[in-house]
C-alpha cells in the first residue's frame, strides 16, 4: 500500500479529530470543520456501526503515527505476543519508533518530516547514523541531528515551532546541541486520552 500524499487536513476531517499532521501550533479546528466529512458538500458524518467505530479508531491511530496497514498489523501482533495490556503495548511500540522520537524531540515539525530526516541520514542514535524510521529506540538512548545536517532550515524551523509546545516528560532535549535523551518508555497516562486503543484490540480480535 502506497503512503498517502494528499491534503493532510482532509485526513483529519475524515477522522473527525486533529491527527497532528501539520506543523503549526494553532488548533486545527480553526482551519477546517472537523465535524463534517471531506468533499465538496462536506456532508455531516453518519452514525457508524460498532465495527465502523473500531475501524475508524484503527485508521486514526495508524495515520497519526504514519504507519502503513501491514506495518500496523505487525505491530499489533507483536503487542499481542508481549506480556501485559495489548493496547498499551501497541502504543509503546509506536511511540518508540525513531521517526516518532525525532518528532517528540522537536527536530521535525511533523512525523512525516521526521521520517524524511531519518531516511535522509540526518539522524544519529548513540553516535551512529540510523536511516530506518521504524528503528526501535530504547530507554536512555541519545538521539541527535548529524553535524552536517544541523544547518538545515527545516530543522531550525521545527525547533522554533517545538519551543512553543510543551515537551514530553520522557525526553530531554538540548536545542543548542540538537541532541536529546530518550529518558524512559512513556506510560499510558503520558499519552493522548483521545486514543481508545481498546477499540483496536477488539477490531483485531474478531
From Swiss-Prot:
Listed GO CC annotations: small ribosomal subunit
One Gene Ontology molecular-function label: rRNA binding
A matching Pfam family: S4
Domain S4 RNA-binding: 96-156
A GO biological-process term: ribosomal small subunit biogenesis
SMART domains from the UniProt entry: Ribosomal_S4, S4
Family listed: Belongs to the universal ribosomal protein uS4 family.
Function: One of the primary rRNA binding proteins, it binds directly to 16S rRNA where it nucleates assembly of the body of the 30S subunit.
Subunit relationships: Part of the 30S ribosomal subunit. Contacts protein S5. The interaction surface between S4 and S5 is involved in control of translational fidelity.
Name under which the protein is recorded: Small ribosomal subunit protein uS4
Organism: Shewanella pealeana (strain ATCC 700345 / ANG-SQ1)
